[in-house]
Amino acid sequence: MKVDNVKSQMRKGMLEYCIMLLLHKEPAYASDIIIQKLKEAQLIVVEGTLYPLLTRLKNDDLLSYEWVESTQGPPRKYYKLTEQGEVFLGELEISWKELNDTVNHIANR
């Protein structure tokens, strides 16, 4: 098994959580999420991965979106967390802290 494969799977597993964290801070246009924020965090994502994930989160009532006129080109779809999304994110944060604590405990034995 290659290390790169494991690292890739770990990143994919955290993608939903990271997107929700970004949208908790402010609504975002999908390309902003792809090009800037996730890339800066070394979570490289292609549109074929991001858009189905955003759609699933929206269908689960965790995200909503609104169309905003653009100064260049067509209107843009800005995503934001719903109230239910905020609650779900809180649950994910608890799970992340528990998982992180567990890994740190094992690593420091």
Residue ranges and their predicted role:
Residues L43, V68-S70:
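Short polar/acidic secondary-structure junctions
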Residues D61:
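Glycine-centered, phosphate/nucleic-acid-interacting loop/turn motifs that mediate DNA/RNA or nucleotide
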Residues E86-R109:
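Amphipathic alpha-helical dimerization/coiled-coil segments
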Residues T71, P75-E93:
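Basic, amphipathic "hinge/linker" alpha-helix immediately C-terminal to the N-terminal HTH DNA-binding motif
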Residues K7-T49:
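N-terminal helix-turn-helix DNA-binding core of bacterial DNA-binding proteins
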Residues L50-P52, R56-L57:
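Basic amphipathic alpha-helical segments that dock to polyanions
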Residues Y65:
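Short beta-strand "wing" residues that participate in macromolecule-binding interfaces
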